[in-house]
């Protein structure tokens, strides 16, 4: 628990003591103490509606309750300098800022661990994201899903969850047959032979190149093989090459995975059949018109779903149910899926499926990644200038850069449409949010270098009493919020809460820098204290940026 959290907890405890001392409630009737951080600085550091909550129990007007409560509050123990009662009975608390100085040694000691909390308590969580079909390049939706998914994993881990990152490889569907047929056509064409592309073929440049590579390496070897043998090889070859490309792009984008899970393995290990048997034994299926149906309407779905078609083949839903059962059988207590915008209607049937298998519907959360629109020179970008094709993750990394792409994708709520201004993302101005926050970090590093050159050293035991200005306290309060922001972002699964925070921290730093002199040639003690504050700011900025996969440059 960091200093700000300690102060908050101490205040909660002192409010409970004051409520009981004023005779307003007992242990049995006292409500939970809710402390919020007001949006307006004039309303204090913390505020509570406790007086309104107690009105029914105490049978008094909230303002009167607020007066009686605050009269009994031990301000010194609660580290409170001033209290104001506002409106119908809100109680606004203003901290004794001198206590905030203790935040600095806490951050300096923690370094990269600053911001860690234990709200997750080691709970096993699996996040499955990207999971693009291995049949082409990663597009904008996949790129946004990768940025959001990785940031969420980082945040969950920082908040004390045991996180596993998984990519589900769709390698068993008809799309892999189409990949093999497309590769076959490109292979024949590379040999100068005529071969039509399949109706649902893949026309990407990558497939053309794979065909050329095969022709160059193997010559006409596969022409003389049976179609069955040839397509079996092309399936395996095409899948391997596509996955290599996807893995390479994601690795460059700083998105690691702990596990790559093959859909095919669900069939080869008999897991799909086992899951079907479980559903049958539980009475969750029935036969109709030669097909096997899942009673998903029992769990709120708008209609029952087919699991096995009348020709004996499985629907897409069947292996997906088996896959989710397997996740639980691997010991995960919570599943988070990050899906594209076109999967919204799929959520009720998956929640129905896990309930039918005996799990709680809240054990599965699904984040929907909304569409991305690119803009350049004020106009919507539909095609890449480099390839003339749809814009890919690789195009964005090359044209905009990894940091800007990661930050912009994490900057808005995942379920809201994102307009991505490519000109803004590469501009070196304060209007560019990623430049603004990275420049804040570089600026702090510059101050720290200057202090070192002047021999102004500091450590955890440095005298911090010279820190006394309003701007310094504003910065300390903002630094102190970080662990709570991490906890909130994890619990609400909101990576954009981190980008909002880091922008606020950068803004608070710039405000301090414009108002105060960090290094005062006439006051070494003040300079050392302020440099310690700068180091705490630098650590917090870097830690926050790392959560969304963005680097913190020391020079710009």
From Swiss-Prot:
Cytoplasm keyword on record: yes
Q: Which Pfam families match?
A: Arg_tRNA_synt_N, DALR_1, tRNA-synt_1d
Chief subcellular location equals cytoplasm
Q: Which reactions appear under catalytic activity for this entry? A: tRNA(Arg) + L-arginine + ATP = L-arginyl-tRNA(Arg) + AMP + diphosphate
Location of the motif 'HIGH' region = 132-142
Q: Where does it reside? A: Cytoplasm
Q: Could you tell me the EC number(s) of this protein?
A: 6.1.1.19
What keyword terms does UniProt attach to this protein?
Answer: Aminoacyl-tRNA synthetase, ATP-binding, Cytoplasm, Ligase, Nucleotide-binding, Protein biosynthesis
Instruction: State the disulfide connectivity.
Output: none
Q: Which GO terms describe its biological process?
A: arginyl-tRNA aminoacylation
A molecular function annotated in GO for this UniProt entry is: arginine-tRNA ligase activity
User: PROSITE patterns, alphabetically?
Assistant: AA_TRNA_LIGASE_I (PS00178)
Cellular component GO terms held in the UniProt record: cytoplasm
Class of this enzyme = ligase
Q: Member of which family?
A: Belongs to the class-I aminoacyl-tRNA synthetase family.
Under the subunit heading, UniProt states: Monomer.
UniProt cross-references to HAMAP family, sorted A to Z: Arg_tRNA_synth
Q: What is this protein identified as?
A: Arginine--tRNA ligase 1
Which gene name belongs to this protein? argS1
